[in-house]
């Protein structure tokens, strides 16, 4: 059997996807399924004074119209069960249609259920809602009196202070810069829009086909909301058409689909429209970040101050921890201060979006480092090397398997960085301005709870199950590769099943935790399997392992267990099962949340090098070349790992150059509500992207040695592009996206 972890493998689900056989959540065929259409508020704050649904109810095919006047109350889960890794998250603290209050424009105020989507949409347009509007808070300035400084975010400290920052910033002998960087609202727009099909069987059993990153979380939230036993709620989601965070929590359409089906007495599908993705499925909050840096003339940082301001909603707390997840850990400095300020406003709740905190945080910090390098007349790579942190700057413990220096070196070599002329506007390709920029990438290594079930059959095939997810990342393939190696069977003999709440516990597919977390559960289950086989073998007089101690036995070759000290004394899985008269054997592992390792810090690292070209007469930025070198521990699947980094870079190009959601200051509604106005990168915008990896497996982090790769690719890339734009033009744009009007 050839090595299964590491080599490039075609995706095991690839054929299903390209032939259209893969079923996404709203594609399941459910008999007599009706359609739900949501009605939105057109004010940002106030109360509903009246709702007229008579015309809507008169539309042929309408089965029910739900409003706050006729919708039963939902039940909230206890906070300790709802928040956190095991219980799921509701993105709004309020439940839909349970009161007359309006907290943001686009809030769902009614649900129409009809036999066809056309009937539901027509009826929805006939619902008349009267309001008593109030003055909304829509900006940081308007909500200044409501400012909050949260101490923690998901148990992570976000207000950080080390050393005397004030003294360093006042020291006249130091070189200093202070600048403010702005990122706009960015909206989730995966290929697959969010959606749910709800099917009741009586009053006590509910099945949801839901586009989610967390089937177990949805199961818990929905079971509590409807007062059901957990095992009576099934969540099914075998495929996800992209998520990036927007499907990690439970949004209001999920609960409305279930309630609509309950009241209408038929299955109901609610498919969030592209338009409603801009109000009902989450966004990255806008940020305003002020960076102050002080360094000696040879480039040694003496102080870093990172003050972040972000928005959240009045119905759900979300903190985009920009500084805590970048400045708090990236560079060595005797003085570091990170402050996070959050303003509650009347917009829908922000949510996780690929590298929440790290993505905007690294943009600001890495641009500030570039500006400092110019003030010092120092190469940007040399400045970063001068301040490389072997230990965590605020926890003072060593980083495990950190190879950032090698990433800088290899990236610079592949890119040809040594040929860079540091002077702005000094490099050209004919009449076109050429700019080269770089930045550091980073993302934490996360571990959560998980369980895995393995069924080994006598024909040397195995099925592995976990209620985890494949968001399009290649998880099916990676988990099959891990299972193949850990169990000891050929890749083709493994079937990995996921995406059902019936399976053993799987964590949210977020925080780049899945490979390490689920991989650890698979490792544990494989160990239990080998032990179970050993227990059969040592009791079997026909086995070469008869009467030996099970603790002395391990997997010694593919499909065989044997003595640790003498691999020649071994027995085949298939033979053990056949002699025992068993067609199969089944085991299940349970991995609890690991205790914090206070002796080491676990973080992934990388370096982006970027080239841009800009016609000075029409200053549109074209990214023409990117080299990204990553240090993420063991590479489980070379092909999908490369794709994940490339995808992060592409998303970062959108962040840097095109993506922005604008709001009407009068209504609070987003003005950009489709892909014609909200510009994501297309093939024409994406350059050659070279991806490479450095470092060794991080076995101190988990027994697989792998750290996640889903999010690190987007960190730092927007800064690398912005730095390249400055190098090309001599103009520093500090508010994203970098559109042509900002370069004129």
Regions found by a protein language model. Give the residues of each.
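Thiamine diphosphate
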Residues: 230, 239, 243-265, 269-271, ...
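C-terminal catalytic domains of large/alpha subunits in multi-subunit enzymes
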Residues: 59, 69, 227-232, 262-270, ...
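Extended active-site and interfacial segments that coordinate phosphate-rich ligands
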Residues: 12-16, 125-138, 213, 220, ...
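Short acidic, glycine/serine/threonine-rich loops at helix termini
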Residues: 75-80, 123-126, 210-211, 219-221, ...
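Glycine-rich loop/linker segments at domain edges
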Residues: 7, 13-19, 80, 86-88, ...
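Flexible, low-hydrophobicity surface segments
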Residues: 1-156, 179, 253
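Short, aliphatic-rich beta-strand segments
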Residues: 36, 206-210, 461-466, 623-625
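Helix-loop-helix junctions that connect adjacent transmembrane helices in secondary transporters/permeases
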Residues: 145-226, 388-461, 671-682, 687-693
